[in-house]
């Protein structure tokens, strides 16, 4: 699927903006002049005195009932629009897996009423603009970038893409061929295998796995009529949230948006419920047969939590110390810095809004050292569950999160997109106002408590993508073997076209 890209003019502006922000957002360290600390853990942060903007200052209700977040930015002669759409591949029928993605692609690349796809491309190119459509698991996003002087014409094109796609059959046939070719190659990259098999192990037949369940049969079954029905179901004004920034006057852009949506029929959206609870998977060691590689991808974890749990801030700090904080985190130090086993390692709590996410730790290494590296991670998980962290370590982790609170508000465009996303996901209006205070309140006792509450060594699932024979042999330098961690199940690599 074609992703949003900024034209040459936009890239120049973006680069200048990025460089300026890089200077503005460098953390202010409290160290004596000329003093160089011997380790990042010893960096001291000055108090950040920053008050995030409030969503109510950017929010507007359009005539049709849709919400728009807008910010004037006369310094840059551009217009940027994002339209969030409450939809996603989680809501498509399993037997039509791939429908949401193909609908989004054809909205942009299958022509619109009165224009072929080539004619639409030409008009957008003449404006030095860009329009993209992307429908992923839990949302759709339609984006526009153009010069502000071309706003009227560009918004008219955006309206055509949103309201009047024709889903040209020839374009559908071409894209279907591309998708089938992509499926044929889905086992070539071990990253794809790892992600897919992790979803299946963790979630079984939960709707969140549908994006990974495209098959030759499901893709071939998708018709133009399916796309028309999918578009009609989800693309209507009250199901949109707008994020708009650029060189305009507020009253003018609101009038343009109202005009764009006028006369467009609405209806009530009936989203299929997404189960928020999932059963815990069976603990054990699962080895996916991929014998033509010389390294293993290793992931271990279990079912975790949703986004808005009461102790989310302590959880952020705890995982930052464990494996989410880059080179200062314990897993990265042990696996990469101390032992040199992997270039990339870490841990993360994925925290979706609609259902429980997962805790996962990961690294990639030679087959022989996989069990040794896994044991190092287990040691760190046990350590953070049983030993209270030093207050200084906790304070440094907190300071990092607090200093980054400016990032969602670094430009006018990021401000409105942050608030549109928060609106879409139901985040409280005062979330950012209270963010720093809530992070500051986290104590070493809180870190220990959430580690004990949300890390479950007895529920761990171990996923290894690599050559099972080589992985199980291990290393003569280390005694650890994957059989130490649970019962081993060898899982044949799925057929890329059928997933059987």
Task: Give names to the regions the model predicted.
Residues 80-145, 210-212, 326-341, 353:
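M16/MPP (pitrilysin/insulinase) zinc-metallopeptidase core fold and M16-derived inactive scaffolds
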């Amino acid at each position: 699927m074609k992703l949003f890209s900024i034209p040459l003019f936009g890239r120049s502006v973006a680069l200048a903006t990025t460089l300026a922000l890089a200077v503005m957002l460098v953390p202010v360290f409290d160290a004596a002049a000329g003093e160089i600390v011997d380790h990042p853990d010893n960096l001291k942060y000055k108090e950040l005195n920053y008050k995030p903007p409030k969503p109510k200052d950017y929010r507007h209700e359009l005539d049709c009932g849709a919400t728009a977040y807008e910010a004037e930015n006369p310094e840059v002669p551009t217009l940027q629009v994002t339209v969030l759409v409450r939809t996603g591949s989680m809501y498509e029928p399993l037997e039509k897996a791939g429908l949401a993605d193909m609908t989004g692609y054809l909205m942009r690349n299958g022509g619109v009423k009165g224009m072929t796809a080539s004619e639409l491309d030409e008009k957008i190119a003449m404006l030095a603009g860009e329009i993209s459509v992307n429908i992923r698991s839990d949302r759709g996003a339609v984006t526009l970038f153009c010069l502000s002087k071309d706003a009227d014409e560009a918004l008219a094109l955006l309206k055509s893409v949103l309201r009047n796609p024709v889903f040209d059959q020839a374009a559908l046939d071409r894209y279907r061929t591309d998708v089938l070719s992509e499926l044929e190659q889905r086992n070539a990259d071990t990253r794809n295998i790892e992600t897919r098999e992790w979803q299946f192990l963790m979630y079984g037949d939960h709707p969140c796995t549908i994006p990974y369940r495209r098959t030759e049969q499901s893709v071939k079954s998708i018709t133009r009529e399916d796309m028309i029905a999918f578009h009609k179901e989800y693309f209507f004004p009250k199901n949109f949230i707008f994020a708009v920034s650029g060189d305009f006057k507020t009253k003018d852009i609101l009038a343009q948006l109202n005009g764009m949506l006028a006369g467009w029929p609405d209806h009530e959206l009936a989203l299929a419920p997404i189960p928020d609870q999932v059963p815990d998977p069976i603990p054990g060691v699962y080895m996916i047969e991929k014998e033509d590689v010389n390294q293993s991808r290793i992931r271990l974890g279990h079912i975790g939590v949703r986004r808005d749990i009461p102790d989310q801030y302590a959880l952020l700090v705890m995982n930052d110390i464990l494996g989410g904080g880059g080179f200062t985190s314990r897993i990265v130090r042990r696996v990469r810095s101390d032992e040199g086993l992997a270039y990339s390692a870490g841990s993360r709590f994925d925290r979706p809004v609609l259902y429980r996410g997962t805790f996962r730790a990961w690294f990639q290494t030679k087959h022989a050292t996989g069990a040794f590296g896994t044991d190092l991670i287990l040691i760190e998980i046990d350590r953070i569950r049983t030993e209270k962290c030093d207050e200084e370590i906790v304070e440094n982790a907190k300071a990092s999160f607090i200093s980054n609170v400016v990032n969602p508000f670094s430009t006018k465009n990021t401000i409105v997109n942050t608030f549109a996303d928060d609106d879409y996901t139901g985040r409280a209006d005062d979330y950012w106002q209270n963010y720093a205070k809530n992070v500051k309140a986290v104590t070493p006792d809180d870190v220990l408590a959430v580690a004990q509450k949300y890390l479950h060594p007895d529920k761990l699932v171990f996923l290894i993508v690599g050559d099972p024979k080589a992985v199980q042999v291990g290393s003569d330098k280390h005694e650890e073997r994957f059989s130490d961690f649970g019962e081993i199940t060898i899982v044949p690599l799925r057929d890329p076209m059928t997933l059987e």
